[in-house]
Curated annotation (Swiss-Prot):
EC category: hydrolase
Matches recorded under Pfam families: MafB19-deam
Family: Belongs to the cytidine and deoxycytidylate deaminase family. ADAT2 subfamily.
Chain sites annotated for binding Zn(2+): H71, C107, C110
The protein, known as: tRNA-specific adenosine deaminase 2
Entry keyword set: Hydrolase, Metal-binding, tRNA processing, Zinc
Function: Probably participates in deamination of adenosine-34 to inosine in many tRNAs.
HAMAP family, A to Z: tRNA_aden_deaminase
Gene: Adat2
Protein source organism: Mus musculus
InterPro entries attached to this UniProt entry: APOBEC/CMP_deaminase_Zn-bd, CMP_dCMP_dom, Cytidine_deaminase-like, tRNA_aden_deaminase
EC numbers: 3.5.4.33
Length: 191
């Protein structure tokens, strides 16, 4: 018997995920995060799963594209929209039945986008203490925000330690896109 992790209500009934599904999809999200790290990106990876099928996936592409909005979730949202177009599906119907699996708590921008898309459930790894939009900084996920889509359920903490270790590895590196320092060093002469 499959152990159920969580459920939330969608327009057509409950959205339920099992421990086995969560492990399977979070493994793939971690793979995406590692791919981001290999490409000198903040290591965040995600999958959007509709009817047990990955319809969108993403990893951060901010440094690669020089576009600050290309977070993993935004890349995945674009892929879901493309999938809907290719399969003749209504994006609103698909998003209302899609679960997001992501290695790090979505930032405020991404949480707002997920809410507007009416994603019912987000499963994430570690908290985002600086920019988290699911409770760490702001709670976009469940706040009473008129005309901003539908609140969504969050399940935090899946493989959080692994996600934190990936982030630590990234932040130990030098950022090749950081601007050159404009501080001039004085010449020191011995007297």
């Amino acid at each position: 018997m499959e152990e159920k992790v969580e459920s939330t209500t969608t327009p057509d009934g409950p959205c339920v995920v099992s421990v086995q599904e969560t492990e399977k999809w979070m493994e793939e999200a971690m793979r995406m995060a590692k791919e981001a790290l290999e490409n000198i990106e903040v290591p965040v990876g995600c999958l959007m799963v509709y009817n047990n099928e990955v319809v969108g996936k993403g990893r951060n592409e901010v440094n690669q594209t020089k576009n600050a909005t290309r977070h993993a979730e935004m890349v995945a949202i674009d892929q879901v929209l493309d999938w809907c177009h290719q399969h003749g599906q209504s994006p609103s119907t698909v998003f209302e039945h899609t679960v997001l699996y992501v290695t790090v708590e979505p930032c405020i921008m991404c949480a707002a986008a997920l809410r507007l898309m009416k994603i019912p459930l987000v499963v994430y790894g570690c908290q985002n203490e600086r920019f988290g939009g699911c409770g760490s900084v702001l709670n976009i996920a469940s706040a009473d925000l008129p005309n901003t889509g539908r609140p969504f359920q969050c399940i935090p903490g899946y493989r959080a330690e692994e996600a934190v270790e990936l982030l630590k590895t990234f932040y130990k590196q030098e950022n090749p896109n950081a601007p050159k320092s404009k501080v001039r060093k004085k010449d020191c002469q011995k007297s």
